[in-house]
């Protein structure tokens, strides 16, 4: 298995698909990376030379924010919103949907399992 950005990527898959196993790289960025490096789209990971793996690794380190750094930045952005006390920060703090979805019904994923209320059923 090739190890890129701290992630073991599967060797049997095509390079474009395998790169999407890295947090922060989707299909669009994976296409960009292999075009920059000059690897054919149909090439599989186990067919890559060490030099090509090194080029991919350097390109990702230089041009993209992935894995731990990306997760840290996302959590810091959410923490900043909560510290500001803005509406979005309050919604994050309370564990409710942030982007205007209804909560009277639905929103179970964000709110967690339903809590039983005593005397509610008749």
Curated annotation (Swiss-Prot):
GO biological process: translation
Region of interest (Disordered), ranges: 99-122
InterPro entries hit by this protein: Rbsml_uS13_C (IPR027437), Ribosomal_uS13 (IPR001892), Ribosomal_uS13-like_H2TH (IPR010979), Ribosomal_uS13_bac-type (IPR019980), Ribosomal_uS13_CS (IPR018269)
Source organism superkingdom: Bacteria
PROSITE patterns: RIBOSOMAL_S13_1 (PS00646), RIBOSOMAL_S13_2 (PS50159)
Molecular functions (GO terms): rRNA binding; structural constituent of ribosome; tRNA binding
Keywords on record: Ribonucleoprotein, Ribosomal protein, RNA-binding, rRNA-binding, tRNA-binding
GO cellular component: cytosol; small ribosomal subunit
Membership in a protein family: Belongs to the universal ribosomal protein uS13 family.
Summary of the function given for this chain in its UniProt record: Located at the top of the head of the 30S subunit, it contacts several helices of the 16S rRNA. In the 70S ribosome it contacts the 23S rRNA (bridge B1a) and protein L5 of the 50S subunit (bridge B1b), connecting the 2 subunits; these bridges are implicated in subunit movement. Contacts the tRNAs in the A and P-sites.
HAMAP family per the UniProt record, alphabetical: Ribosomal_uS13 (MF_01315)
Subunit structure comment from the entry: Part of the 30S ribosomal subunit. Forms a loose heterodimer with protein S19. Forms two bridges to the 50S subunit in the 70S ribosome.
Protein name (Swiss-Prot/TrEMBL): Small ribosomal subunit protein uS13
Lineage: Bacteria, Pseudomonadati, Pseudomonadota, Alphaproteobacteria, Hyphomicrobiales
Gene that produces this protein: rpsM
């Amino acid at each position: 298995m090739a190890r890129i950005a701290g992630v073991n990527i599967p060797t049997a898959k095509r390079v474009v698909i395998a790169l999407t196993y890295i947090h922060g790289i989707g299909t669009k960025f994976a296409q960009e990376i292999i075009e920059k490096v000059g690897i054919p789209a149909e090439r599989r990971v186990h067919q890559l030379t060490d030099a090509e793996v090194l080029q991919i690794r350097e390109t990702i380190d230089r041009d993209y924010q992935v894995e731990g750094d990306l997760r840290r930045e996302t959590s810091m952005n959410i923490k900043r919103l909560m510290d500001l006390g803005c509406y979005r920060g309050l919604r994050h703090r309370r564990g409710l949907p942030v982007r205007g979805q209804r909560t009277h019904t639905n929103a179970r994923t964000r709110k967690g399992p339903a809590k039983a209320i005593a005397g509610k059923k008749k």
